[in-house]
Amino acid sequence: HAVAKGVITKADQLHICYCHSPIRYVWDMYHEYLEESGLTKGLKGYLAKYMLHRIRNWDLISSFRVDYFISNSDYVGRRIQETYRRDAVTIHPNIDISNFDLCVEKEDFYLTSSRLVGYKKIDLIVEAFSRMSNKKLVVIGGGPNLEKIRKIAGHNITVMGYQSFAVLKEKMQKAKAFVFAADEDFG
């Protein structure tokens, strides 16, 4: 998790941090998280900002305990440089693609799948497809924005909610393309 790099090591121990992202809710997505949580005003907002500021300070200080950073993508490596002023070597994580067979025969729809939260920008995709009534979109995923997504979906959009891996796999194989709009850590 985001705090693992803060471990205090002995002088003779090497500390290597494989970083998937600097803590997004205190750095690059700070304002989005506060807005989505309704914490921009009032006492709760003040306390949240105070605590996030403290976490940001701790995060920066703890980054100096790391001997070497490894990032999961060049994109995250740049964010490590911007956030901690530290270099990182990129080693991409292993991805098991053995469960996904190539399907040559595509059906007439596009697919997006994600946890339905604001920063994944599924609403942006749904709004765009609602304006392209000749294009079909299938949305798979659950989360706090599920009902919002259902309300804004046009007639050409099927919102399936959470589905099993088998259903997701089938839809991924048959879709014309996967549509993605989020600012994702893997780049």
Can you name each region flagged by the protein language model?
Residues 146-170, 177:
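Nucleotide-activated donor-binding/catalytic signature segment of Leloir-type glycosyltransferases, i.e.
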Residues 173-186:
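Acidic donor-binding loop of glycosyltransferase active sites
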Residues 78, 82-83, 89, 94-108, ...:
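Acidic anion/phosphate-binding donor-loop and adjacent secondary structure
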Residues 101-120, 126-140:
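Conserved donor-binding/catalytic core segment of Leloir-type glycosyltransferases
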Residues 35-69, 77:
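Membrane-proximal helix-turn-helix segments that form the acceptor-binding/catalytic region
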